[in-house]
Amino acid sequence: RNVMTDEIARKRVEIAIVTFNSEVEVISDFVPIERMPTPEIRATGNTDMAGGINKAIELVKQRTREYQCLGTSFHKPWIFMITDGVSNSPIDEMLQATRNIHFEHKQGCGLKFWVLGVADYDVDGMYQLTDEVVELQNEDFTAVFDWLSESMVSVSKTSIFEDAGLKYDDMPDGVIKKEEY
């Protein structure tokens, strides 16, 4: 079921959009899914991946603190990064971004981090960030977003204490769980 047609998911799922090419830009801070903008995003220029990752983590941590201050329970936050290339960020910045991902996953806000690689992305580099790497083989983004939507509906119905995530056995055709080389 689509996240927009599910009453519980529609109330619980919030989305933020961060782009990173030569510059990092917050297209949308966290908003309920029903108010999410649908921007046209194009791959241009360089790929400041470290800057994009760190900005996304910053937004997640800020939102987590807001929930904690309000005493509101919440599911583990997700970052789902879509990339078509190799990072142009300096090595030390990528190493720091990698450390930030691992810290927030293990000790911080419980962050779940996935990568969707398209075209000529850096598989090995993505596995330094996370074990959760999926590959889009036929550029069918609609199927991927439908799959994500179904996963969010499932997670929205679980207890906040359950470790729910993407269901790899339900992936659409043309999307595979990429194995590390």
Language-model-detected regions and their locations in the chain:
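VWA/integrin I-like adhesion module and closely mimicked acidic/polar interface patches used
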Residues: 85-129, 135
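Von Willebrand factor
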Residues: 1-27, 36-75, 79, 112-125, 139-147
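Short, flexible, mixed-charge acidic loops at enzyme active sites
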Residues: 28-35, 129
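P-loop NTP-binding core
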Residues: 28-31, 69-71, 88-94
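DG-centered beta-turn motif at the end of beta-strands
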Residues: 17, 56, 72-90
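C-terminal helix of von Willebrand factor
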Residues: 130-178
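Alpha-helix termini
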Residues: 2-9, 61-72, 101-108
